[in-house]
């Protein structure tokens, strides 16, 4: 379970304070798939980075499986797999296999465990023939597949994805959606941000809407549709902004 308790994050820029996330609270049960919606600059990435322990909250706390992320960072990091859009975390001069071996070692996997995981992930994503190619020389879609494999190499319980289908072709994007379905069946907790409303509707049990750092909705899609008496998610999102609603 992930508990977000009254979390805020402020940045200082040219003597001004930027309130990226403001007093956000919600809970994500274990094994749930959550879609994070909001316009550019809404605070989605900042919130994901705080859950991932990359950033610390200015105020409030984040609890993952009963452990405070600010106090047990390394233990929490081993539970989490992270992919932030085009920030693949890969090394261009290394092959796909060398990249995956490197990250497997960082997470404490044995050589045998690493090889088994790499073989399984390569088969899963159809990239076996690319394992010995340098990452800098493969297509964007294949690079994203390697990045997703890197995210899953240590078999994390919590998976955080920021705009994961951005720049992917239709085949690769559909592969990602299938992956989410499989990970959900495995009991993984998944939080991903997206601008594609249909993608969120197809994959998520729960959605979180953020506008200018404020939480404007957290709950199931069905509850939201019943409240708004429409299933047009774009319309609902804009209507809540216009009405100035907060959760």
Spans of model-derived segments:
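A short, flexible loop at the N-terminus of ABC-type nucleotide-binding domains that lies
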Residues: 1-4, 10-23, 73
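Conserved ABC transporter NBD signature motif
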Residues: 60-70, 76
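Conserved ABC ATPase "signature" region
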Residues: 101, 105, 112-130
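Conserved catalytic motifs of ABC-family nucleotide-binding domains
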Residues: 155
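Catalytic Walker B motif of ABC-type/P-loop ATPase nucleotide-binding domains
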Residues: 159-163
